[in-house]
Amino acid sequence: MIRPFEEQDSADVVALSLRAWGPVHDSLREVMGDELFDLRHRPDWKAQQQRDVESVLSDDANRAWVAEQGQGVVGFAAATIRPEDDLGEVLMVAVDPSNQGRGLGTELTEVATDWIRESGMSVAFISTGGDPGHRPARRTYAKAGYRELPIAYYFKAL
């Protein structure tokens, strides 16, 4: 069941996001190398990810949803709209590893996209990495009807 996020879900959402994004960060470390990865994810990726998730969940401009199974939260998505640009962004999607590969990420992405559409926006977008760790996310977004735009980001340790 997917329902709107409630404040009491926050700790569960943070915990599942850390589990879900562990393999992604392992892949990023491999692609970026230890030095650059550590510089980019100070003090460590888990602390940064927790701050990022908590920030998205606490921002009143955003909307979030959770997927429940049994008594637990097993996935979430968050989105925002930018009326001045006539677009919305799916900010985050995460599914607990034990529930991945069953279409839940696509379903959460579609719920967020529906909210963007219902908010009157003409375009929705989502961004993700091109590294191997983000391959499941890219498949999820393609299944939800998003088209990939090849964009490259370059980083350099200073």
What are these regions (language model features)?
Residues 4-91, 96, 109, 115, ...:
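Acetyl-CoA-dependent GNAT
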Residues 84, 129, 154:
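Residue-level "edge-of-site" marker
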Residues 91, 127, 152:
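A cross-family glycoside hydrolase active-site/sugar-binding cleft signature
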Residues 97-100, 125-137, 157-158:
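Conserved beta-strand-loop-alpha-helix junction that forms the acyl-donor binding cleft
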Residues 141-151:
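Conserved acetyl-CoA-binding loop of GNAT-fold acetyltransferases
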